[in-house]
Swiss-Prot record:
Keywords: Cell adhesion impairing toxin, Disulfide bond, Hemostasis impairing toxin, Platelet aggregation inhibiting toxin, Secreted, Toxin. Coiled coil: none annotated. It is found in: Secreted. Disulfide bonds join 3-22, 17-37, 39-51, 52-57. GO terms for cellular component: extracellular region. The keyword Secreted applies. Pfam families: Toxin_cobra-type. Inhibits ADP-induced platelet aggregation and inhibits the binding of purified platelet fibrinogen receptor alpha-IIb/beta-3 (ITGA2B/ITGB3) to immobilized fibrinogen. Belongs to the three-finger toxin family. Short-chain subfamily. Antiplatelet toxin sub-subfamily. One of its GO terms (molecular function) is toxin activity. This is Thrombostatin. InterPro entries: Snake_3FTx (IPR003571), Snake_toxin-like_sf (IPR045860), Toxin_cobra-type (IPR054131). The keyword Cell cycle does not apply.
Length: 59
């Protein structure tokens, strides 16, 4: 699976993942969009990530 992994509004970069999903989320404390491999359950007051299961689905 290929996922985007750039921070915020930087030019898109990708990575090949061993996971079966990609995520995209906006962190509330700094407003920065984060992207990467996998899907996880957030702790505390972190926002829930948007997860998807196809190549480059987290732009």
């Amino acid at each position: 699976l290929i996922c985007y992994n750039q921070l915020g509004t930087k030019p898109p970069t990708t990575e090949t993942c061993g996971d079966d999903s990609c995520y995209k989320m906006i962190w509330t404390y700094d407003g920065v969009i984060r992207r990467g491999c996998g899907c996880f359950t957030p702790r505390g007051d972190m926002p829930r990530p948007r997860c998807c299961k196809s190549d480059k689905c987290n732009l």
